[in-house]
Structures are given as structure tokens and as C-alpha cells.
Amino acid sequence: MNSTSTVRQPGGPRQQRRHTPKANLSDLYQRAFKEAWVKLNPKIMVKNPVMFMVWVGTLITGMLTLNPNLFGVTGTSAMFNGLVTVILLFTVLFANFAEAVAEGRGKAQADALRSTQTQTYAQRILADGSLEMVSSTHLRKGDRIVVSVGDIIPADGEVLEGVASVDESAITGESAPVLKEPGSDVASSVTGGTRIISDELIIRVTADPGKGFIDRMIDLVEGAERSKTPNEIALTVLLAVLTLVFLIVVATLPPPANYIDSPVSITLLIALLVALIPTTIGGLLSAIGIAGMDRVAQFNVVATSGRAVEACGDINTLVLDKTGTITLGNRLAETFLPVNGHSLKEVAAIALAASIFDTTPEGKSIVRLAEKMGATLDFDRQQAEGVEFSARTRMSGTDLPDGSEVRKGAVDAIRGFVRSRGGKSPTGLDEAYGKVSHLGGTPLAVCRNDEIYGVIYLKDIIKPGIQERFNQLRRMGVRTVMLTGDNRITASVIAKEAGVDDFIAEATPEDKIQVIQQEQAAGKLVAMTGDGTNDAPALAQANVGLAMNSGTQAAKEAANMVDLDSDPTKLIDLVTIGKQLLITRGALTTFSLANDIAKYFAIIPAMFAGIGIGALNIMDLKSPQSAVLSALIYNALIIPALIPLALRGVKFRPLSADQLLQRNILVYGLGGIIVPFVAIKLIDLGISLL
């Protein structure tokens, strides 16, 4: 159907914002409980070698419950076998429940993202300029559409015309509207599912239905199978080897036990095996990995894989853009500094002419400052032509109708431009350049043809608290490198004030890749942020690439993490989360292995009670049966008891690796020995009262 364009003006009925729904804990636990039973499928259980052995043991003791003499006379009753079976079954279920809860939280995030997607109608612009109302499912990449106040943007796209405020709270959770306009990579990118709350935009669709940003995020979050990280695989292999070794040890016990006339029942052998193998970390390992991705999601960051989250914890070098990460964002024109005898008004007029086609926030601030000083254009803008900034020339400007060329840019670039036209560097330029640089600002020179008129002072403000965050990273052994297009003096001042370890001035996009490659060649893992198309190669090269949701499609596709809030500083938080993931896994592994000591002292004396090794019963457990049941009950209950810690993570402290290791051994090693001794004794006392 064809129609004419009708533009709804601001001031109409206020649209109610949708908020990302939170997962209902009751529903989450109910689904996790059901999923725990589903995961008893042997095809699923075999993926976790530790819990698979417990599962097999459950089947065997279950058969012995039905027929205690199935494998010959064992000396254990059906009642005892049944109790062991129930305890082992719950051990497996608790491990499955931990994984299901972690997975459920990820699925809740996918549901929240999916809730932002609604089938809407869009006004598609046809070749003759007329409008056609179509369903959002019929839009294709390259289509041009019109969206007005109150409309939900039907697909990912790029703003071609117009300026409007967009409510992105459905995706980012941030209530403040975001200004969208053509020009810069960041401001011109829009995401399907967000809402126009003022004015009108003409957008070019950049993704087919089902292939937009939100669709990709949903696919990543609820992928059919979470791929394990290298460290997780290594730990799984270690646990599998330990399980095999202990299985061989247990399997070789019956002959010597029979020889000393102290036969051991199959049920007791299974109990010993379960006590020997590291069931605690085996039951929580998957949950820890999934929870790491979930903690990242709670920061409104979507990771493409657990590998990316884990890599954050191993990062040695952070490569950070100055603007937006270390400083508050867009530099703003503060004042003009005339040189070569020119007046302030003359500099303002040339700066206005050089910036009139510049749609960046910096360019607009120069225009505002010049107009505030009374500057006006002395040419017809329609007959002039804008010259865009490029990383190669490091300047931009305007070609005037009379053939004159006005330019603004890096001081050395403008010097070269003027000299190429027969001019020379004027007196006072170096002084103005140095003055701005020593203030930590960015100096831009402005010229007309072969004459430099003055310097523009662009002011940068360091983000509050950023120095302390860099100090924390330094204590963790992470090196920070600031990249900036500023000159060396300005870069040095800002680097010193911010507290970064190193900086690269007058950097180009190629420099980012070189820095990353140099660090990686030295065996370092590198993380960086980016939002523009020119950042995409470096984001792909980095071990951790964090793209901004407000950035270009190319940047988001190259990165392995996307920040829905578009906050570059969040990369520092991700390093902390990654280290917390590794520390949590290490702490619970230490605790699990230390637990085994108490379980040995409970079960081994019970197995060989007839040969007089009562001295090993240091916990004074009441009976062999009570000792076995107490150890197995503790073994089962410790898994759900540690689920909150596995999901939340061990509290992170910015310490060195040696300090973290010492603390890990003291808290989780010593604690892993003491806690089970106390708990098993208390359980034994409880059983004796029954």
C-alpha cells in the first residue's frame, strides 16, 4: 500500500517505556529443578567425568538395594544400600541443579532481549520517493525507511537524514535518551527495538530480519551448547585423570582386603570412590563458567563466548583510547589563540568556515564558539564544498567558492599544508601550541591557503577516579597504554594526570594494530575498546575486543564482547570479572581437594573396622555405617551450599598473583580441611540420635 508521509510532531502522547524484565527466582528454581532431572540423561552426564562416575555408582547401589546379593554376599543391608543410593542421587541432582540455575539466568537474559523485539510496521521509501507501509519482517538490507516520534525502530540501521532522540532503555536499561544524527559512526547507528521519542529520521536498513544485533545477541546467549574455555577444558581433563586414578585405586582394594580377611562391600567401595574424587568442583565447574558470562551480562555486556570472559582475567595489557575512556568524551572548543598578528575575530571567522561542514561534536562546538564571538560566513554555503577529516591527512575543512582552501587540524599537518602552498610557519605558533598542550588540551591550527591564522584550544577533562582504577590494575600486573591523536606534549600531560603506564601520541588506526601485535608477540594478552569501523581490525586482533553498542556494525561484528551501555571504561570492570572467574574456579578447586582429607578419615576406618585401625577414626564417629553416610551426606550438601558462591564469585581483591595464591591456600585450603571435619562430626551426631 502506498501513502504520503505524515510526520508526527513532538508533544504528542507520551509513550510508556518498556523495561528489561527481571527473572522470577521462583520460576527460575522450578525450571532448574526440572532440568536437573532431565540432565540425568547419560548422554549429558558423560560430559562431566566426575559426576558421571557418581551417576554410575548410583545405578549400581540402586541395583544392590533391590538385591543386596546381586554381586555375591556383600554384608550390607538393603536399607543401607538404599540410603547410599538416595544420597548419591541427590549429589548428582544438586550438581545438575547448579548448572541449570546458571543456565537459567542466561536464558532469562535472552528472554529479556527477545522481549524488545516486536513486529512493527515501517514506512519504506520507494524509488519514486513515495512511502509504502510494510511489516518489519519484509524489510531488507539497503531499504530506506522513515521513522517518526513514537515509532519503534523496526531494524538495525544507519541514519541518513534528520536529528532525533532515541529511547534505548529497552536494550541498555539507561533511561536517558540518546541523540541520533548522520555524520559520525557512533551517533548514526540505530538498533532495532529502540523507540523514537522526538522528531523524525530517515534510516538505511543494515540488517535483514533475523540477522540484527539483538538476534545475534540472543543466539549467543542461548546457544545450544556453551563451548568450554581452555582453562576449563584443562581442569576437566585433570579431574578426569584424577577420577581414573582413584577408580583404579579403589578397584585394586578388594584382593588385599580379602587377603587380610576384611572383605569390603561394593557399596563401601563406591562410597570411597565418591569420597576420593573431587565431586565438589566437578559438580560446580560448569556453573562457575556459565556464571562468569552471567556476571558480565549483569554489567550489560554480552560476550560471544566464555573464552572471552576468561581471557579478561588473563589480560596483561589494556589498550585504551583517550577520548571517552580516560577523558569524559567529546572535546569542546574552549577558546581561540590568534597568531601572526591576526585578531581573535579573524581566527573565529576562519575556524567557523573550516568547521561549517564538520558534523562531529568537536566541529559543532567550534561553530558554536565562533558564532558566540560574532563570526559569520562571508560565502554562500551552498556553493562551498566540505572536506572530511581523514587519518592520513589529519585535517578537515572547506573549499570556498572563490577557490580558497580553509583547513583545521593537527598543527604539524597544517604546517605541512601551508608550506606545500608556499607559506611558512608564523611567529607565535609554537608558543600557542605549547600553551594549549601544557594545559592538557588539544591544539588545532586553522589556516586559509598559505597562511595560518591561529590555534583552537579543545579542552579534555579526565574522568573522576580513573587514576585509582589504573593503580588497581597496576597492582594486578596489568599494563595500561593510552592511544591518542594528540601531540606528544598533550598526551604526556594527560597520561601523567590519568596514571597510565605508557602512551602513544598522534596515533592512527594502524598504530592500534601494531601495538596489539607487538604486545602479543611478547607473549601478552591484550584487551581494547572501539566503536568505529576503523577500530574493527584491531578489535578482531585483540584477545578481548569490547565494542560499543552505539558503534558501527563492523566494530560489533569484529569484537568478542559488546557493551550495551557504550561505556568504554567498562573494560576495566571486565578485567576484574575475568580475574574473579579464575579465582573462583581456583578457590573451589582448592576447597574441593582439601575436603577429601576429612572424608578419607571418615570412610577408610569404616571400611576396615575389623582389622583394628580405630586410631584413624579421629572424629570418633559412632559406627562404620554412620561414618559412611555422614561423609556422603556432607559430600552432597556442600554442592548446593556453594552454589551462591559459584554464581556470585569469590570477592575479588586487587592483589599480586603470589598474594592471591597465599590467600587462596589459607582460606580455601585450610578452610576446606576444617569445615568437613566439623560438618561430618555434626551429621554423625545427628544420625546417632535417630
Curated annotation (Swiss-Prot):
Q: Which residues form the active site?
A: 321
Q: What organism does the UniProt record list as the source?
A: Synechocystis sp. (strain ATCC 27184 / PCC 6803 / Kazusa)
GO MF terms on file? Answer: ATP binding; ATP hydrolysis activity; magnesium ion binding; P-type potassium transmembrane transporter activity
Subunit structure as annotated in this protein's UniProt entry: The system is composed of three essential subunits: KdpA, KdpB and KdpC.
The record lists the catalysed reaction(s) as: K(+)(out) + ATP + H2O = K(+)(in) + ADP + phosphate + H(+)
Instruction: Please classify the protein's predominant subcellular localization into one broad category.
Output: membrane
Its record classes its membrane topology as: Multi-pass membrane protein
List membrane-spanning regions.
44-64, 78-98, 233-253, 268-288, 601-621, 627-647, 665-685
Q: Which domain of life is it from?
A: Bacteria
Q: What is its EC number?
A: 7.2.2.6
- Any one cellular component term from GO for this entry? plasma membrane
Gene of origin? kdpB
What does this protein's UniProt record list under function?
Answer: Part of the high-affinity ATP-driven potassium transport (or Kdp) system, which catalyzes the hydrolysis of ATP coupled with the electrogenic transport of potassium into the cytoplasm. This subunit is responsible for energy coupling to the transport system and for the release of the potassium ions to the cytoplasm.
Q: What is this protein called?
A: Potassium-transporting ATPase ATP-binding subunit
Region: Disordered, residue numbers: 1-23
- Sites binding Mg(2+) sit at 531, 535
What GO biological process term is on the record, naming one? potassium ion transmembrane transport
Location in the cell reads: Cell inner membrane
Q: Keywords in UniProt for this one?
A: ATP-binding, Cell inner membrane, Cell membrane, Ion transport, Magnesium, Membrane, Metal-binding, Nucleotide-binding, Phosphoprotein, Potassium, Potassium transport, Translocase, Transmembrane, Transmembrane helix, Transport
